[in-house]
């Protein structure tokens, strides 16, 4: 008679999955909002839309962390990629004026390493807590043979809400409006295939002091900045005409996504100093300037477009909220079919 087999023999450890759930419950609990009904563990999570909304619109977004995860594996650094995961989605839905309500994650691996997965999901919970977003559930998929040992993949899903009359569309943007830029916290979660290629070719000392007490390793792996609370504070007092989360495609490919077809964002390249990380990437990789602008955020993580008469006040308020804000340039009329973001 053949030996009796179990799911664990096939590579799936149900007990490990149960232990992970117990590990993360206290962190998820800290993220809860009044709109969430019930606790973790149900087949579905219940969230009600508060009565403060007259005509609510739900705004959804999903994203991952990309090949930044490869550095997390190589450097055994797993406690901040969860923050990246949350930021990539909540910053996206923020662009349309939405307040993030809840977040779900998908964690997939070949063999579940409970301490490592706990670090990742603690980071997710931290990102949710910092953005006022409830971590209401997720999926942990242990799939033997699907991923190399020690590796995993992440995906995140955020849903927010905004009054229909307050949805930010960018349609009111016009010539003379001011383009503000909020400083990034590094490369965030984009351009890492090129970053990894540059590191591989240049072979730098990753642990030497690099910038303001940080090593190059720390500068490269720094988590994506969350802009939720400062932007929501600005929206309470001012009209923001348009925003762009500077992700894949960099400054020149993301800003046009919110501009009317007859407008151009004219950005002054001297209005902010290229952070040291990007200076190093450009030099070590011999990367052309325009390639930098369409690959990396180059130090600008979120672009905010406002009327000229509001620019000083919005810049001041965001500064009070802890943001470093640059006046990048102006909106002008488009000439022919020129590219809608000009950096010069």
Swiss-Prot record:
Q: What is its main location?
A: cytoplasm
Q: What is its EC number?
A: 6.3.3.1
What keywords sit in the KW lines? ATP-binding, Cytoplasm, Ligase, Nucleotide-binding, Purine biosynthesis
What's the short name of a Pfam family annotated to this entry? AIRS_C
An example molecular function term from Gene Ontology annotations: phosphoribosylamine-glycine ligase activity
Its domain of life reads Bacteria
Concerning InterPro entries, the annotation shows: PurM-like_C_dom (IPR010918), PurM-like_C_sf (IPR036676), PurM-like_N (IPR016188), PurM-like_N_sf (IPR036921), PurM_cligase (IPR004733)
Q: Give GO BP annotations, semicolon-separated.
A: 'de novo' IMP biosynthetic process; adenine biosynthetic process
Q: Which pathway does it take part in?
A: Purine metabolism; IMP biosynthesis via de novo pathway; 5-amino-1-(5-phospho-D-ribosyl)imidazole from N(2)-formyl-N(1)-(5-phospho-D-ribosyl)glycinamide: step 2/2
Q: Where in the cell is it found?
A: Cytoplasm
Cellular component, GO annotation: cytosol
Question: What reactions does this protein catalyze?
Answer: 2-formamido-N(1)-(5-O-phospho-beta-D-ribosyl)acetamidine + ATP = 5-amino-1-(5-phospho-beta-D-ribosyl)imidazole + ADP + phosphate + H(+)
User: Is Ribonucleoprotein tagged as a keyword?
Assistant: no
Q: Does the keyword section mention Protease? A: no
Q: What's this protein's family per the entry?
A: Belongs to the AIR synthase family.
Name this protein carries in UniProt: Phosphoribosylformylglycinamidine cyclo-ligase
Q: Per the UniProt entry, what species is this protein from, by scientific name? A: Neisseria meningitidis serogroup C (strain 053442)
